[in-house]
């Protein structure tokens, strides 16, 4: 009985921690030189989703805001713990920071965005630069960069900049869980 009580209490505490992290659908976290916004989407039961109205489908699945000048916008979905985001640096560089909803066990400032994650970045705007741990990668329109999982030496800091604020880079980003680190690699057409 005591073991059941402890297990139940621990499960409840974990649930409360995740609920506290994600109790509102949108958060605004001040990052260096920009705002990082994110919202959390919970997984939907396929049997329930069949009966959603058009408005409910849009609310559950459409991502309304991906790009905004000087901001990073993320959507964290419980389907595969996937992050979908966009960044549009204008006059100031944008540093990618961790999100509170990714880590409930430690303070966010002790975590990096790519702890246990990998990141793909595609530039769909003007010319821009992605700097990973001090090494710069220039990305033109439709060029991409793969950034592997962070480890003790690599992928600790990611900074995004635009070459021309009048025609800013628009970095579309996807991040998924990763269990192995691979080197950063630029991909061109």
Predicted regions and their residues:
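Active-site glycine-rich loop that binds ribose-phosphate moieties when present
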Residues: 149-156, 187-189
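Bacterial Sec-dependent N-terminal signal peptides
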Residues: 1-23
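Short acidic-glycine-tyrosine-enriched beta hairpin
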Residues: 133-151
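A generic local secondary-structure boundary/capping motif
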Residues: 72-73, 110-111, 155-163
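Sec-dependent signal peptide cleavage junction
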Residues: 18-36
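Intrinsically disordered, low-complexity, positively charged segments
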Residues: 39-104
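Glycine- and acidic-residue-biased ligand/ion/polar-headgroup-sensing regions
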Residues: 79-98, 104, 108-134
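Surface-exposed beta-loop interaction hotspot
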Residues: 159-189
